[in-house]
């Protein structure tokens, strides 16, 4: 007795099961892994580190665009037989995450400064743990063929240590120094912020001419 075909394409179940099958078969792993006994050092790899999305909630269309583009490049090189690796990860987001955590605490009537540094950092890590899984699930849902066994977080001990070491080396070489500069200052966070973190607001004002 023949089975009736569904009237609509059940993309959620079909694509989820296909993605799981790809992963279980190890198709997202590099074929020339340096840890393998068959490693060929002359076989040049193709590696991309994913621009890590911030752990600030959910992905947006911009993330979907770059994930699709990078996945296209990764799959293209993989199909050519080139050792291919796509390293996934997420970013702690710094001030952006801090602001969201502060807003969440404010709803509970809690102030960051009253909470103290250590307790506040605990709240930040709780936020990361909560939204990290959602973001990773969304990246997987997009079909990203990353090697998830190599996933990193920008505040992982290894990453943090590497950043501190490079920063210290640059400082000792005199390439990092303090000086008087015009900066963007946030009176709420009591810290400097970058240009891309600025939110501009247009206001009507007077235009003065000096005779």
Segments (PLM) and residue ranges:
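N-terminal, positively charged nucleic-acid-binding surface of large information/translation enzymes
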Residues: 1-211
């Amino acid at each position: 007795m023949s089975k009736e075909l569904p009237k609509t394409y059940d993309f959620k179940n079909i694509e989820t099961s296909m993605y799981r099958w790809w992963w279980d078969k190890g198709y997202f792993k590099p074929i020339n892994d340096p840890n393998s006994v068959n490693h060929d050092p002359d076989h040049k790899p193709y590696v991309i580190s994913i621009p890590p999305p911030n752990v600030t909630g959910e992905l947006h269309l911009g993330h979907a665009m770059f994930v699709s583009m990078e996945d296209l490049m990764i799959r293209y090189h993989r199909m050519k037989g080139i050792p291919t690796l796509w390293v996934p990860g997420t970013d702690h987001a710094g001030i952006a995450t801090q602001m969201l955590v502060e807003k969440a605490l404010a709803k509970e009537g809690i102030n960051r400064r009253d909470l103290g540094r250590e307790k506040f950092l605990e709240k930040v890590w709780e936020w990361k743990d909560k939204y990290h899984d959602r973001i990773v699930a969304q990246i997987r849902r997009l079909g990203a063929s990353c090697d998830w066994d190599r996933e990193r977080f920008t505040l992982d001990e290894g990453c943090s240590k590497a950043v501190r070491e490079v920063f210290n080396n640059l400082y000792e070489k005199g390439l990092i120094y303090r000086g008087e500069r015009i900066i963007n200052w946030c009176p709420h966070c009591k810290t400097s912020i970058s240009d891309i973190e600025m939110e501009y607001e247009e206001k009507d004002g007077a235009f003065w001419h000096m005779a």
